[in-house]
């Protein structure tokens, strides 16, 4: 399995499985002399960790991160930073039933066909539990971006199923109520939508089913010039990073698929001596950041781990009926907000370091 790393100058490599002893990552390229401790990383992990609300999986993990290397006397040394999180609340017995069966909609079938072996306990390496280390690495990137460049990377949930936020609450990026986002379990800026989300999730849990979601990531104060045309365009790398998150099925930059119905006279972001008039492009032009806020949206599918019986096959290609046991999120999009922030921050810092290495 060769796809465990992302980034060039700021590079993150993760390892570990859902029901293994621990999860870990190596972060290369962190500049020296940045103050760093576990306390800088833990808050983002706490936002992602399971068992924090009645709307997510009941699996409980403290997700306490430990820095193993790359920090001396409270400051980064410029060498590889090793991070580890111990797994604690595994219940592997929940998965004994599917040792020889493929959960429909999961990676079970493709992992088995590709490698001839798979860790069936909670999905092993294919589990979203792996993303804890992305969030840990992303917290380091977010701290450096904020302290050295004033760049803020934040996200919010905009839709679960057919319940959407009022678009007026996010029409002006500079006026998004980030305190409201931080104060509810859905990372949502619209208190009315929060009520609707809660009602929908309670209904789904009663039915033993799941639902998809859409979320948005906003990066503010990004300077002009990030991105390496033609193949390493900033939007291409962002799409790559965001699509690598479990359950993500679509990525939009700026207006995304809405551009299909727009005319050129509407979509083009006109300019005046005072700056851009609009931001349909989502802060990226020609694969290079324009200095406007970078806006990306992702859509996540409903998890296939549900209590509703479904048809599948076993290792012998025989028909079976499957009900997924274990503890699962009714909507994986809820805990994906800090993950999407992390992946965005990792890409932005990587491109900032590349920009500094070759440009004025």
From Swiss-Prot:
GO molecular function, one term: chorismate synthase activity
Cofactor(s), names only, from the UniProt record: FMNH2
Keyword flag Metal-binding: no
Pfam families per record: Chorismate_synt
Keywords, alphabetical: Amino-acid biosynthesis, Aromatic amino acid biosynthesis, FAD, Flavoprotein, FMN, Lyase, NADP
Membrane-traversing stretches: none
Pathway: Metabolic intermediate biosynthesis; chorismate biosynthesis; chorismate from D-erythrose 4-phosphate and phosphoenolpyruvate: step 7/7
Residues bound to NADP(+): 48, 54
GO biological process, one term: amino acid biosynthetic process
Annotated EC: 4.2.3.5
Residue numbers binding FMN: 125-127, 246-247, 286, 301-305, 327
Reaction(s) this enzyme catalyzes, per UniProt: 5-O-(1-carboxyvinyl)-3-phosphoshikimate = chorismate + phosphate
Listed PROSITE patterns: CHORISMATE_SYNTHASE_1, CHORISMATE_SYNTHASE_2, CHORISMATE_SYNTHASE_3
Residues annotated as signal peptide: none
Coiled-coil ranges per UniProt: none
Source domain of life: Bacteria
Note on cofactor: Reduced FMN (FMNH(2)).
Class of this enzyme: lyase
One cellular-component annotation, GO: cytosol
NCBIfam families, per the entry: aroC, PRK05382.1
Recorded family membership: Belongs to the chorismate synthase family.
Subunit structure: Homotetramer.
Function: This reaction introduces a second double bond into the aromatic ring system.
Protein name: Chorismate synthase
Organism: Actinobacillus pleuropneumoniae serotype 5b (strain L20)
Lineage of origin: Bacteria, Pseudomonadati, Pseudomonadota, Gammaproteobacteria, Pasteurellales
Gene name of the record: aroC
């Amino acid at each position: 399995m060769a796809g465990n790393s992302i980034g060039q100058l700021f590079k993150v490599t993760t390892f570990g499985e859902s029901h293994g002893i621990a999860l870990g990552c190596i972060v290369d390229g962190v500049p020296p002399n940045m103050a760093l401790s576990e306390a800088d990383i833990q808050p983002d992990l706490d936002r992602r960790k399971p068992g924090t609300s009645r709307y997510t999986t009941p699996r409980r993990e403290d997700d306490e991160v430990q820095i193993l290397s790359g920090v001396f006397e409270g400051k980064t040394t410029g060498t590889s930073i090793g991070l580890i999180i111990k797994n604690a609340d595994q219940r592997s017995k929940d998965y004994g039933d599917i040792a020889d069966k493929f959960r429909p909609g999961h990676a079970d079938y493709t992992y088995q066909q590709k490698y001839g072996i798979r860790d069936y306990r909670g999905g092993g390496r294919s589990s979203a539990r792996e993303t804890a280390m992305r969030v840990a690495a992303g917290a380091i990137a977010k701290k450096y971006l904020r302290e050295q460049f004033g760049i803020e990377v934040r996200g919010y949930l905009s839709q679960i199923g057919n319940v959407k936020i009022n678009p007026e609450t996010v029409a002006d990026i500079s006026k998004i109520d980030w305190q409201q986002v931080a104060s509810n379990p859905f990372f949502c800026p619209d208190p009315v939508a929060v009520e609707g989300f809660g009602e929908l999730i309670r209904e789904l849990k009663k039915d033993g089913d799941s639902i998809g979601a859409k979320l948005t990531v906003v990066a503010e104060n990004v300077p002009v010039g990030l991105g390496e045309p033609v193949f390493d365009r900033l939007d291409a790398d962002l799409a790559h990073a965001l699509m690598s998150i479990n359950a993500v099925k679509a990525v939009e930059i700026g207006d995304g698929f809405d551009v299909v119905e727009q005319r050129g006279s509407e979509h083009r972001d006109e300019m005046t001596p005072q700056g851009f008039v609009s931001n349909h492009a989502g802060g990226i032009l020609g694969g290079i950041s324009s200095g406007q806020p970078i806006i990306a949206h992702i859509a996540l599918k409903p998890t296939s781990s549900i209590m509703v019986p479904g048809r599948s096959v076993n290792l012998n290609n025989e028909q079976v009926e499957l009900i997924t046991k274990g503890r699962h999120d009714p909507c994986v999009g809820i805990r994906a907000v800090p993950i999407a922030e992390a992946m965005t921050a990792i890409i932005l810092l990587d491109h900032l370091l590349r920009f500094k290495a070759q440009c004025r």
